[in-house]
Amino acid sequence: MTAIDFHKLAKIELHCHLDGSLSLSTIRHLAELAQIDLPEDDEELKQHVTAPVTCESLLEYLESFDYIRPLLQTNEALTIAAYDVAKQAALENVIYIEVRFAPELSMDKGLTVTETIDAVCQGLRQAQEEFGIIAKALVCGMRQSDQSLTACILDEANQVRDSDFVGFDFAGDELNYGPAAIKPLIEQVKSYNRPMTFHAGECGCPAFLAESIAMGIKRNGHATILAQEPELLDEFVKNGVTGELCLTSNLQTKAAVTVNDFPYLKMKAAGANITINTDNRTVSDTNLTKEYELYHKYFDSTVQDFYAHNKTAIEASFASDEEKEELLARLAKAYS
């Protein structure tokens, strides 16, 4: 059997967090600009920005992000960061990526919501021009934040009409802030008639994913709980929801305690819409090439599986119809 060149495969990524995916060299550059001291040794720095291989919980995993927040407080920093993440993706043959970020986490020093979105989109455009990747931005509301603040952030974001800002998400502490707890914010985003994805099913609570499906949300970040819930999986498939799966991240946070607790094979057998993602390239010390290697190792995923999942990702993406057509053609050619 011919060995698969996982790096060479064309790839699509829908679930990648900006602040969790910065390269060490970019972290150092941003720290220099912000006049923040970092450990000189890369291994020591990595310990601060990469979560433990096994965390006690999702909240422990999220602690790594606190280290990055002070570095992303200017337009310049956000542009550099967005360019860096899209470049990393392009260099492993990702042809389309959606990079998500929370404006709130970059407003500590006076940036407006609009400024954060403009800065991120500028960085993504630079990478698009240089590497030929199509790179788009998603805006996250933080579910644990003050709801009136989040409502204002979402409204200001909705005023931005940039073709590279394509949708919304809610991230953060799912366990304590499930869909019902932030329902007014979800309804607010739905009223915009703009695309939306949603983190649910990462913290072991099937009700949260069920609520997300009932609210009509068609893309779901993680969906890990489907491994344990056959009836919910049936609903997921029946409603045409697409799962943004993040294997390494789920094993770290214990959303999936072992590979057997990860929903991929059950979702595949049920005919669910599946996409493969990194979640956080740096915090999880991964990239899509590594993820594909793991799917092949643990689940015997084939090149045809990867083609199918990438096709699903394009169809579920928030790209324009013209971009989707172009991407589907590029993907078909790459896998022919």
Swiss-Prot record:
It catalyses: adenosine + H2O + H(+) = inosine + NH4(+); 2'-deoxyadenosine + H2O + H(+) = 2'-deoxyinosine + NH4(+). The record marks 222 as: Important for catalytic activity. GO terms for biological process: adenosine catabolic process; hypoxanthine salvage; inosine biosynthetic process; nucleotide metabolic process; purine ribonucleoside monophosphate biosynthetic process. GO terms for molecular function: 2'-deoxyadenosine deaminase activity; adenosine deaminase activity; zinc ion binding. Its cofactor is Zn(2+). The keyword GTP-binding does not apply. Keywords: Hydrolase, Metal-binding, Nucleotide metabolism, Zinc. The keyword Nucleotidyltransferase does not apply. Transmembrane segments: none annotated. Its EC number is 3.5.4.4. GO terms for cellular component: cytosol. Binds 1 zinc ion per subunit. It holds the Pfam family A_deaminase. NCBIfam families: aden_deam. Belongs to the metallo-dependent hydrolases superfamily. Adenosine and AMP deaminases family. Adenosine deaminase subfamily. This is Adenosine deaminase. It comes from Streptococcus thermophilus (strain ATCC BAA-491 / LMD-9).
